[in-house]
Structure formats: C-alpha cells, structure tokens
Amino acid sequence: MTAKAPPAPHDPARAIDPILERIFSFPRRHFLSAGDLNAPQATDLLDLADAFVAFNRQTSKSLDILKGRTLMNLFFENSTRTQSSFEIAGKRLGADVVNMSPRTSSITKGETLIDTAVTLNAMRPDLLVVRHASSGAASLLSQKVSGSVINAGDGQHEHPTQAVLDALSIRRAFGRVSGLTVAICGDVLHSRVARSNVALLHTLGASVRLVGPPTLMPAQAERWGVTVHHDMKAGIAGADVVMMLRLQLERMQGAFVPSTREYFRFYGLDREKLARAAPKAKVMHPGPMNRGVEIDSDVADDPEISLIQDQVEMGVAARMAVLASLAHRLEEHGQ
C-alpha cells in the first residue's frame, strides 16, 4: 500500500490572496482618519491584518505586493515604533523604502511643508507616510501630491493606523470588538490616539469611556459619543479593556497636573485600580510608557493581562494591511 503523502504545510501567504481579492478600496485615495472607514471596510482591513500576523511569524517574510513601488517615510516628529513598523511593513511587501528626517531636510532651512510636498511629488513616490506636529498636516500634504498619503500622527488630531492595530489587538484577545467596553484613560486632551480609537471602536460596535482629570479632558468630549469620568476607579469599573495614554508633557504649556506623583496616585493604573475592571480585562498602552506615572510595571509586564507587546507586533501587520489596501487602490486607478 502506498503511503499517503503528508499534508502540505500551511502557507500563511496563501491566506492573504483571497482577502486581497475581496478587499475594499479605501473610500479615499489616502488614509487620513479612522473615521474614513465604515464597519465592513474596517472588518476587511482587520481580516487582512490578521492574515499578515500569521505571515510575519514565519521564517520567510517577503511578498511582492508593493514591488516597484516607493514608500517614503516623512517623520517631522520623533518616532520609534511607528516609523520602524512602517519601514518593516513596506519592505516585507516589496517596496523601496526611503526615510526622510527633518534634521537633514530643507525644512531646517525654512522651507514650508507645501514646498516640501511639491518637491517630493516631483520624485513620484507612490506612498507617503507622514507624521507632523501640526493638526491637518497630512491632509494638506494629500492635496499636493499624486501618491497616497497615510497619516502617521498629525498633532493632537488623529493617528488612524494606531487605532487599527489597537482594534486588531483587542479582536485577537477577545475574538470580537463589538459589545466590549473600552476605557481610554489619562491625557485625552493631547491624545491623537484617543481620537482615532474612539472613532474606530465606535464603528466596530464597542462602547467607549474616557477617563481623566478635568484639565486633561477635551471640552464637550461627550459629543464624541462617549461617557466621561473623572474618577478612575468608577471609570474603569467593569471595563473589558483599559487603555492607558501617555502623559504628553511636551504638548503642555501650563500646569495640567500638580505632579507626576499625584497623577499616578489618582490616574495611574495599578493592581488596586485594575481590580475594578472586568475579571478578564486586558490592559493596553500605545507607548512609549512612563512607568510609575501612567502605569505600574507590575501591570504593564504581566503577560496574562497586558496586550502592550502584542500592540507592537500588531503594528507591523496593521500597517502592512493599510499599505496593501492603498496599493490595491492605486492599481485600480492605473497608477
């Protein structure tokens, strides 16, 4: 009797193709806001990102989805996680990746962002990833270039790919996003992460709470469709996910908190406060963390409850999904 051949090993790359075949085109040529996505589009994007997670865990991590395309990273603010993950994402998809630093650009010589955009557009990059200290910078750039622009953070406005990776982390931990309660805690006022997460989590069916001191809460935040809490323990009571935010001292021009010690006492996440959340609650932080200010190390480093390292891994997969989807749209339009 002839022995049966062993089953072919699972190839994560093959799981990507059918998703790409049914993938939506982005509602716009650019990805500037988490609000650009409706629920089916967001779900498709998470499905694609999920396939890239499996792909990234194999030994060979090379695809040709962006072969012949040029990805340019324009980071006018410091970044470790976001810039590195976009660079890795682009290279794994086969793109030529160019990193531009403001320290070596003509911006230091007085060139405006618009002039920079016009100059870069003459080089015909296909995809431009932009981080800038000014709200609306990515939108402005998108009006001046022929390639697709991805907002990697514009001032206090938005950080849409962070919201995608956060939603992916939550979905992988719970198997769903819809019906969950997510408490976003801390410096909401200065947080582009909070704004993008509120938009995407609502789209995916989650209930969102904002928790923080009155001095760090946007005026009329309830208009975002959230509940606002100034008491940390009450705000995270029964929450499935507790998402901590970095205290952005560099964006503060006054005394928003008495001291970091006092801030941790009332709004830093420790075991005692976390006990108020749901029994199987998960903890998140977009990074970089200020340990002992926003979150206790004992909580941040506990693999049973913390998704913080998962968020870093999901960042590459989520950004691969965004880049691949935009490339799909470029092909549809013959670019």
Curated annotation (Swiss-Prot):
GO CC, any one term: cytosol
Role of this protein: Catalyzes the condensation of carbamoyl phosphate and aspartate to form carbamoyl aspartate and inorganic phosphate, the committed step in the de novo pyrimidine nucleotide biosynthesis pathway.
Coiled coil: none
Pathway the protein contributes to: Pyrimidine metabolism; UMP biosynthesis via de novo pathway; (S)-dihydroorotate from bicarbonate: step 2/3
The encoding gene: pyrB
Class in the EC hierarchy, top level: transferase
Keyword Magnesium found: no
NCBIfam families linked: asp_carb_tr (TIGR00670), PRK00856.1 (NF002032)
Similarity-based family: Belongs to the aspartate/ornithine carbamoyltransferase superfamily. ATCase family.
Identification of the protein by name: Aspartate carbamoyltransferase catalytic subunit
Residues that hold carbamoyl phosphate according to the record: 81-82, 131, 159, 162, 287-288
